[in-house]
Amino acid sequence: MPISDKTKKRFAYNSSSISNNTDNSFIEESTKIVYGEEETTKTILHALNNSQERWDNYANSKGPTIAMGLEPLRKGIKNAYSRGIKIRYISEITPNNINYCKELMKMAEVRHLDNSKGGMAVSETEYIATAHLQEAKPVQQLIYSNAKEIVEQQQLVFESLWNNAIPAEKRIKEIEEGYDRI
């Protein structure tokens, strides 16, 4: 049974606090759940556009189809790339998403990790995550946070995953040569 918008709003968790950022101005820290394709897409693009140095992504095999298959997200990534943002992307590269991964590799450093689940992205100041990704379809709900401790924790999680992933070029070569991973 679908959850009504009224129920979603009533149960959505939103916690806020004030934090001092690096330029001595104060920002409101927030952690919340965002629902609906339009709102989640806006939130993803907001975080991507706010990135100043880095945009690190981790996603299951559907992630590249969303990043490159949905026009607003593809444009957002392309814009970040043109602004000089360092983009890194971890996904499970498969025969079904290999072309999306190749397209993504034009703008990002891409790595492969077997059995990837869900998805997340983290910049220097913001974090977003979702548990469910569908091929070339907008995200239905996600968690957003700009809380410093959460962002720092997720940066460490991403670095650990990145260090365990293999270069996309290696995985693509395996697929194209018919090598089957066990």
Predicted regions, residues:
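Short amphipathic
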Residues: 31-35
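Secondary-structure "cap/kink" motif recognition
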Residues: 45-54, 182
